[in-house]
Amino acid sequence: MLKNILVGQSGGPTAVINSSLYGVIEEGLRNKEKIGTVYGMVHGIEGFLAGNFINLSEVADNEPIDRLKITPASFLGSCRYMLPEDLGDKVYDKLFDTFAQMNIGYVFYIGGNDSMDTVSKLSRVALLKKSDIRFIGVPKTIDNDLVMTDHTPGYGSTAKYVASTLKEIILDATCYAHPSVTIVELMGRHAGWVTAASVLARTEYSRNPYLIYMPEHAFDMEEFKKSLKAALEQETAVVVCVSEGIADRDGRFICEYADAASVDGFGHKMLTGCGKYLENYVKAEFGIKCRSIELNLPQRCSSLLASATDIDEAEKAGKAAVVAALDGETGKMITFVRDDTNGYEINYGLADVNDICNKEKKFPAEWITADGTDISDEYIKYVRPLIQGTNIAEYSDGVPVHLKPAYYR
């Protein structure tokens, strides 16, 4: 009897995580002589533990499955669930019993750092149980903070969204003749990759965003005041971009200056509010108009500004995962290997998931100016290829068409 595929999505959604899902489904269906049915976890490993899954082979037979590539967020539904550290916990018995009942031979988990932790634990339990199930991680995160890969699916589209949206914000913020400051808060708890993309919004006629602050460089309120004062001497309207996770020299988040931060299911501090805090600070110190803007969810899941390059690479990563599993690989994550020899090109490799999970790739310090307020041209060379091409969306009655999510079925 042919072994079946089980695929899940976990963590924060992106504009292209469903492209990776499409890649897994397509490659699985293409290998009909080796693979039986493709199943999907509904709401990740947490939902699967509750008995929620979907037959994706049937979906592919009856619906335009390629529409996944223009559907944002997580088609299968997501979760933020940590498997127990104790590999002897009964939850693993339940999982592997269910795998056996469903004749699962290959498990693919699409996600970021914590999702790779899930792949690591499952592959280690498989060794203990002498199971031949193969577990492969497919990278996903707008934060671009996974180690051992040039970049991650989702980041290119977020960078494109940030740059495009900032260009429009800048035009709006600078159209008045009176001094003003606009502070844009972007995602990024410990790594500033998302905020760095704001530099792409600059034009030959405007240097805005004039100041860019990221978690990798300690934030100082007095230095911020001096830098903003200097910027206002050069520009009537100044746009400032900040990562949600900017912190002072003592490691205290700027958002905590106003309120204590909440904690999510993984124990990570939920950071919002540094933009609003800085807005009030600027109003008090400078006495000029100031507003703060949180780009919030659209920066991670807007498909209308998705990068065609990102969509294509995400799909290929999903396909590469199936190929790797069929070749006998397990406990690995698909990696992106850049080759700039003859222009931009990405090759797909593999890395041990244990070398990836619970580690974090920070934005390179050498790509941040000494005063911590700007980004170097090296980053621009790095990111430009990732944002190329435009998503071709489908429309009905003037609004985008998406594939109906699994959790609504």
Stretch-by-stretch model annotation:
Residues 14-24, 48-49, 92-93, 113-121, ...:
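Short glycine/serine/threonine-rich phosphate/pyrophosphate-binding segments
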Residues 1-53:
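N-terminal phosphate-binding or glycine-rich loops at protein starts, especially the Walker A/P-loop
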